[in-house]
UniProtKB/Swiss-Prot annotation:
Entries under Pfam families matching the protein: HTS
Signal peptide: none
This enzyme's EC code(s): 2.3.1.31
Protein name: Homoserine O-acetyltransferase
One GO CC term, this protein: cytoplasm
Length: 307
């Protein structure tokens, strides 16, 4: 089944050209099924690129999904035109009366700040609390995952001496997990962050279970059954060129940066990188959406009521 997004969203044409099944809003209303309602709180600076990355993965699943783009109310990003925000996004204040089958909270380029120093921290805390009563399943990504696990469990983040940057091998620690159905025992995941959470802190919280881990990069994916939350600390959603774009952005800005680990062929930045994580990215999002579909109430208003 396709993903339902506005016909004029820039991601629409890109996804159609890639062969992703996309449905116009007009066509969607003719299907006599309830689409899954998924919200995307997009905290990334380049919102259009993130929209494409997430919609690509959601749109490849066999279920109809209606994606709602959400933004922080009082914060104006510098890298996305205001007309795009007003045309396609709703503020959290505008959607907080609704309920969602799934909700994604992305990363943000603020990880070197203490959480309390982030401009929109108070609003984000309110959103975290809101997900407990208005969302069936929440997927927190990178800094969004670190912020969420800190908010709910006090798990701290630690600064790294240098940026964790590249493609690293990860291990499947729980092959029986519904979220890792079809996963290999060992697989590649893109990593791009300046901070980390540590296994020792997570192990102290009985409700948290580590599903993916890297010997070099540490914890990657944590599941919390009680709150129906996933914490993904790395970037399975990244495009083939995402790490390359970040690398050359920093090089052009004069920021000291090493070549991303195990990314460019022969460590030659002039060669196009090969995507070695795409299939597992699709598996992960497909598994998340399938589990959501199997367990969410048919009547949206029952989400968060325990019925």
């Amino acid at each position: 089944m396709p993903i339902k997004i506005p016909d004029t969203l820039p991601a629409f044409e890109t996804l159609v050209n890639e062969g992703v099944r996309v449905m116009t809003e007009t066509a969607a209303v003719r299907q006599d099924i309830r689409p899954l309602q998924i919200g995307l709180l997009n905290l990334m600076p380049n919102k259009i690129k993130t929209e494409i990355q997430i919609a690509r993965l959601i749109g490849a699943t066999p279920l109809q999904v209606e994606l709602t783009l959400v933004r922080i109310g009082g914060y104006r990003p510098k890298n996305t035109p205001e007309e795009h925000l007003f045309a396609f996004y709703e503020t959290w204040e505008e959607v907080k009366g609704r309920k969602f089958d799934g909700f994604i909270i992305t990363g943000a380029p603020v990880e070197t700040l203490d959480y309390e120093e982030v401009t929109y921290w108070d609003e984000l805390k309110s959103i975290f609390e809101w997900t407990e009563t208005h969302v069936h399943s929440t997927l927190n990504v990178c800094w969004g995952a670190m912020a969420a696990i800190y908010h709910f469990h006090g798990v701290p983040k630690y600064p790294l001496k240098e940026k964790a940057f590249g493609v690293y091998r990860h291990q499947n620690l729980k092959p029986s997990s519904v979220y890792l159905n079809g996963f290999s025992d060992d697989f590649a995941v893109p990593v791009s962050r300046w901070t980390e959470v540590r296994r020792a802190d997570i192990d102290r919280v009985p409700s948290l279970e580590i599903l993916m881990e890297s010997k070099e990069m540490g914890v990657c994916l944590v599941h919390e059954k009680k709150g129906n939350r996933l914490y993904m600390f790395n970037h399975v959603e990244y495009d083939s060129t995402s790490l390359s774009d970040e690398y050359f952005r920093d090089v052009d800005a004069g920021v000291p940066i090493k070549l991303p680990h195990d990314y460019f062929p022969h460590n030659d930045a002039d060669l196009p990188p090969q995507n070695r994580w795409r299939s597992h990215a699709h598996l992960f999002f497909g598994n998340w959406i399938n589990e959501m579909y199997q367990t969410t109430p048919y009547e949206l208003e029952k989400i968060g009521t325990g019925d």
